[in-house]
Swiss-Prot record:
Name this polypeptide is given: Stomatin-like protein 3
Similarity section: Belongs to the band 7/mec-2 family.
Subunit structure: Homodimer. Interacts with PIEZO1 and PIEZO2.
Cited function: Required for the function of many mechanoreceptors. Modulate mechanotransduction channels and acid-sensing ion channels (ASIC) proteins. Potentiates PIEZO1 and PIEZO2 function by increasing their sensitivity to mechanical stimulations.
Length: 291
């Protein structure tokens, strides 16, 4: 390939400011000299018109005869602007908050949602922000909207609800790459709210309720099974030890007397309880082992 033929990216970059910087011609120097002479003649009145104050968080892009002076922004502090030939534009370098209004999005699983967000960005190159784009803030705002719709359109509803941070980071990376030539650096992207249709909300709530009920039934069944195992073990211990049964009997009487002190309890003798059961502990011991 001929080395004189440049790639599309190279040609694209050459259209931006800062690549082809030409000095002032003869006419430019003549106009510059006349403007400077005018300042000297009208001194000290002209000095108040030529001196401009640039704040700490601002930069001034000075155009001299239509060309950016010194190929960089000036400030902070005092700058000199010559009359008739110099024009300057102030650029705020502080972080800007860009609220993205609710965007109607069709997800990958064919669910219509409304998603809004916020983008935090700042200008790091005042020259690029002024010379490479007409309205840098409006361009960033529109690009943030389209990027949000494009990225969320490739995700399912469950992925959007569960992976907000990953999606926001992906949007931030795409925006940062796209706005680099505009002198913009995207600091952070946040997805504020995801609105889904009311009917879908009801179906999701019913599904979640059914899942919770099924989980509760499983836990209750496991608890009853564990309790039945414990009761079985306790009954076997009490059957093997009549003294333990008597102690349990006395403990129950003490508990009833403490909790319900207005109730009079007449304890039955153990031999009567054994008679009601149909067999005494002594007879139980005398029964032959069927095994």
């Amino acid at each position: 390939m001929d080395s004189r033929v440049s790639s599309p990216e190279k040609q694209d970059k050459e259209n931006f400011v800062g690549v082809n910087n030409k000095r002032l011609g003869v006419c430019g120097w003549i106009l510059f000299s006349l403007s400077f002479l005018l300042v000297i003649i009208t001194f000290p009145i002209s000095i108040w018109m030529c001196l401009k104050i640039i704040k700490e968080y601002e930069r001034a892009v000075v155009f001299r005869l239509g060309r950016i002076q010194a190929d960089k922004a000036k400030g902070p502090g005092l700058i000199l602007v010559l009359p008739c030939i110099d024009v300057f534009v102030k650029v705020d370098l502080r972080t800007v908050t860009c609220n993205i209004p609710p965007q109607e999005i069709l997800t990958r699983d064919s669910v219509t949602t409304q998603v809004d967000g916020v983008v935090y960005y700042r200008i790091y190159s005042a020259v690029s922000a002024v010379a490479n784009v007409n309205d840098v803030h409006q361009a960033t705002f529109l690009l943030a909207q389209t990027t949000l719709r494009n990225v969320l359109g490739t995700q399912t509803l469950s992925q959007i609800l569960a992976g907000r941070e990953e999606i926001a980071h992906s949007i931030q990376t795409l925006l940062d790459d796209a706005t680099e030539l505009w002198g913009i650096r995207v600091a952070r992207v946040e997805i504020k709210d995801v609105r889904i249709p009311v009917q879908l909300q009801r179906s999701m709530a019913a599904e979640a309720e059914a899942t919770r009920e099924a989980r509760a039934k499983v836990l209750a069944a496991e608890g009853e099974m564990n309790a039945s195992k414990s009761l079985k073990s306790a009954s076997m211990v009490l059957a093997e030890s009549p003294i333990a049964l008597q102690l349990r009997y006395l403990q129950t009487l003490s508990t009833v007397a403490t909790e319900k002190n207005s109730t009079i309890v007449f304890p039955l003798p153990m031999n009567i309880l054994e008679g009601i059961g149909g067999v005494s502990y002594d007879n139980h011991k005398k029964l032959p082992n069927k095994a």
